[in-house]
Amino acid sequence: MKITRRSLLQLAGLAGLGIFVPACREMFAQILFSPDAPLETSPPLPQNPFRAGSKSLVAIVRGEEVPRMVARAVDLIGGMARLGVAGARTLVKPNVVWGEPPPTTTDPRVVRAVAALAKAHGPASLAVGDMSAVLSLPTRPHLEKTGIAEAGREVGAEVLAFDEGEWVKVHPPKVEYAKTVYVARAAHEAERLISVPVIKTHRSASFSCALKNTVGCVHGKNKPWAYGNDGWEPAVAELNMAVRPHLFVVDGLQSMVQGGPWSGEAVPTGIIMASGDPIATDVVALGIIKAFGRWDMVTSKGVWDQVQIRRGIALGLGAGAPDEVELVTDDLTGGDPHFVTLLADIRRNVGLH
């Protein structure tokens, strides 16, 4: 972890505050101290069951009724039964970076729909959990404020704040930056991990969707900023060697197309996406952001040229080229011309035919 003079001054300020403010003590501990965690084996790369031949499927569904959109998106890529949730410890992981409404955080309606769909397939256990950004800890108040905790409780899921729980230590293979990673035990032990990210721009990581959402499963010592400016974006991809979701259901009801991750310009996109491939998911999300033309960190380069994407491909995390991605779509509204235009923009920006 690179510590600059400015960072040291900031940490000193946090330390002083930590004497008086419990929340600051938690932030300070996450930044400076490694947890007492047992060494575990890094998870294997899960087989993507949501494929058509050699292509990773990415579903995009336009609609108005969130549960129906979520169910349809998952059905389009093969259905929840393909995931093997039955009898498995299942964790739904939204984006709860802090306590602001969507699209800063995942819409609780999407979380509820995903958790309910998983529960209908008979998991051994079901939880909804995340850890907020270090500077906004603790997580529990944000889970409550966003409505995500209530969404989980409504379907009978346990609601977890990872900063309250235990950690394990893993040494991911093939990485350059994230060589020792502390992972929330709940995420490490989940037999089926369903990531429910949002689509948004990001001032440090360029963009945030599938790969970036995994960062909420790791300790403060492993947040991407801990690896310095050069390591920020590649570390996002590398952390997916320590935590490996099995399914991505993306909240695209709104998309942040400028600013982020805390706040920014949001536009209504009215979609849900689903895929088993984080790279395929992210290039499609980038295609959406790029279509609005507001964020230079995305518009200035091709979607396959983003650092997160290049590093993820090198690590074998998913699709490596446009001919390895297939879009499957549905419009439940009966014919939205804006959706037709958006799909055309996505196909052009991702290089799909």
Question: What is the predicted role of each segment?
Answer:
Residues 2-353:
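N-terminal and secondary-structure boundary signal
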